[in-house]
Amino acid sequence: GMKHFPCRNLGNTPRKGTSMDTRVSAQQLRAFMERAYEKEGFEKEDAAQIADVLMQADLFGIESHGAQRMMYYHQNIKKGSINLHAKAEIIRETPVSALLDGHFAMGHLTAAKAMKLAIDKAKKTGIGMTVVRNSTHYGIAGYYSLMAEKEGLAAFSMTNTGPIMVPTFGREAMLGTNPLAFCMPADPYPFWFDASTTVVTLGEVEVYNKRGKPMPEGWTIDGEGKTCSDAPKMNASILNGDLGGILPLGGEGELNGGHKGYGLAIMVEALTSVLAQGMVFPEMCGGHGDHTSHFFMAFDPAMFGDPSEIRARMSGYLQALRDSEKIPGCARIYTPGEKAHEAQADRLKNGVPVEEKTLAELREIAAELGIEGV
C-alpha cells in the first residue's frame, strides 16, 4: 500500500498536545526507540541514528513522522522491503559530489550518510552535493538540512515518494509529496523550512478519514477530475492507485498558482530520481521496496563573506519579519522553524505528547520484539 508516504501537519505547524495524549519523557521515548531498533537487528549506532531522526520529528511537533511511523517501519522490516544489513555505497564521486546507491537500507541511515558526505565536502571545498537512489522513506526532509546547519552550513534536502499528486489539468497521480527543505544558520533559531509541494499530504486526508469529517474543498480531485471533499473515498482511492489524487501546492488549475506547486514538484523529481537515475514515480508502485531517491546539498556561507556577518543579517531579517505589522486578531508572525523550536523546548521539558493509538502500536512492537515498553 501507499500508507507510508511522507505526511506533514498542516502548514508544518506542530500539533498541540490534547487531553487524549499521554506525555512521555523525551529520554524514555528515545531509549525505547533505540531498544526497538537494536532488537530489530540494527547495530547500536545505527539504531541511535534512526531514533534521532524520529525523535527530531516528535520534538518539532511533526508527529506523523515520529513514534507514529514506527509501526510502518516495523512492518516493512518484517516484509523485507527495508534491507537490514545493506549499506549505502558510493557509486561515483568528485571533490564536490557523490552518487550513492542505498541498496534499500533504512532511508534514515542512507540519508544521514549522504548528508555527512555533503557536509565533509562543503567543509573542504565550500560545497557538497550528493544524490541517492534505491533508498527508502527517510523521515522528515528537514532533519538532514538541520545536520548541516549545526555545522554552520546552509543546506537543502529533498526526496521523491510514490505517486500521489496530480499534474495541473491532470487527473492521474504522477508526482509524490516531494518535500523541499532548506536551512540557513540564524539566531535564536535557524531559518528551518520543510514543506511538501502538495497542498496537503496523505496524512491530512487520513486524519479527516479517521474523524469522518468532510475535507476542505480544494485539497483533492477524484477520478473524474472533480474537486472532492469525501475523505474516506479519496483515502481509499489514493491507496488503491486509482485515478484522482492530491492537488499541487496552490490548488486546482492556474488561478491560485497550482502550476507553481506542480513545477516545484517536478524540480524535486529532477534533482532526485532523474539525477540519481533512480525510479521515477509511475514506476515506483511495483517491485522491491520504495525505490526512493534523495538530494542533499550543503554549502559554506563563508565562500561569500564573513559567516558571522551573514548569520547576523539573516537573524536581523527574520526578526524584522516577526516584528512587522500583524493583521487584527493575530498576536504573532512566525518565521519557518520558530514553532518547531518552541515545540522542542516544551517537549524536552514536559514530555512528548503521544496519541493513544500510537502508544498501543508501541506496546504491540515491544511485545513482538520482547523488549521493555515505553
Model-derived features: positions:
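Secondary-shell segments that build the walls of catalytic and ion/ligand-binding clefts
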Residues: 214-283
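Phosphate/diphosphate-binding glycine-rich loops and adjacent basic-rich segments that engage nucleotide
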Residues: 165-239
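General beta-strand structural signal in soluble alpha/beta enzymes
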Residues: 100-102, 129-134, 155-159, 184, ...
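Short, Lys/Arg-enriched N-terminal segments with co-localized hydrophobic residues
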Residues: 1-19
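Active-site cofactor/substrate anionic-group-binding motifs, chiefly glycine-
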Residues: 66-119
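A glycine-rich phosphate/pyrophosphate-binding beta-strand-loop-alpha-helix module
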Residues: 112, 116, 120-160
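Catalytic-core signal marking the mid-to-C-terminal active-site face
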Residues: 23-24, 29, 270, 275, ...
